[in-house]
Amino acid sequence: MIKAVIFDVFETLITHYRAPLYFGTQMAADAGVPASEWLPLWRATERDRSTGVKSLEDVLAELLRTSDRFDPALLAHMAQKRTATVKACFDHLHPDILPLLAALRARGLKLGIISNCFSEEAAVLRQSIFAPQFDAMCLSYELGVMKPDPAIYRHCMKMLDVAPDECLFIGDGGSRELEAARKLGMTAVQAVWYLRPGVTPSQPREDFPQAQTPMDILNDLNP
């Protein structure tokens, strides 16, 4: 019997790709550094940014210094811009996300989040409209472990006091999250409502059941 529903965040609860993007390419432009030089340096820091080793500000300072472009005002501008674009994702929620969460809670289900996220994303999530609606928010930046490591799933299950076969995991499929959830014994469903061919990194796949809309999740619960 399903007792808890655990969600990925990006491209599941919210999407980057309907708000202005501020990824490595846009940062390189603001820094005045060729993208061909900036992007390898930026991408090489992803694990450290995801597991709390380094904050956004730490990494920006390092990269600006490496590129001989360090300026405190520029760093502050870039960090603020990155945070603002994360906040802007909440302006483009699928209209059924909040009704889905309300419907799940009305059924007495526990709700959890497992997200690979950076310092600025974790800060926004903690202050977001989602924060009071979830019983467990397991954020990689805070925990020092990221999907698909089973440890972050186990941590969430411990917080929710549920077993794997009592969990429904919902995600777009990035970071091999669906495979990890299934391997642990969870029911895994791919969220495809934000996925767009040629735009989003993840695409619909045939090896997992799909939810075309958030409300489809209700069909994957106990009869």
Tell me what each language-model feature is.
Residues 2-99, 107, 123:
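N-terminal helical cap/lid subdomain that shapes the substrate entry/recognition surface
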Residues 1-5, 33, 76, 98, ...:
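Asp-based, Mg2+/Mn2+-dependent phosphohydrolase catalytic module
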